Amino acid sequence: MNETYIKDYINLFSHLSLNNIEQFDNFIDKNIIFSDPFNDIKGSENFKKIFYHMFKNVKDPSFIVLNYSKSENKVFLKWKMAFYAFRSKQFIEGLSEITLNSDGKINCHIDYWDSMNGLFIKLPFIGILYALSLKIFKAKI
């Protein structure tokens, strides 16, 4: 596994914009599988559409890769996404599990993050319901 390749992929995420989404083609297999709490897709064009959609619908999104580790054909990234919503800057932290194929291209990218605590509880109606459910179900220790 090429260390420079991984660092270049991380650098792309850290500087991601509408102007450089097409650079993913340098890193991903044309049949990449991508999954996160909202999407399950296959193919490099669909992978890039996820990010075009993000920049269209999310105000000022950015990623910071906090650290990474690698093992054989896998890379794990710990990251923080920042964006503006609900009149303030919001943050979501998550992990990405990235698998490389025998050609060294990324053929699987799975994002793990908590959509309930990271996003949904900040929505007015859902946040109120969530707070009420915590009063019922959360243990008082």
Language-model features: where?
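A beta-strand edge to alpha-helix "cap/lid" segment located at domain peripheries
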Residues: 56, 62, 70-141
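Short histidine/acidic/glycine/proline-rich micro-motifs that form metal-
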Residues: 11, 38-40, 83-84
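A generic structural signal for ordered secondary structure
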Residues: 8-12, 32, 92-96
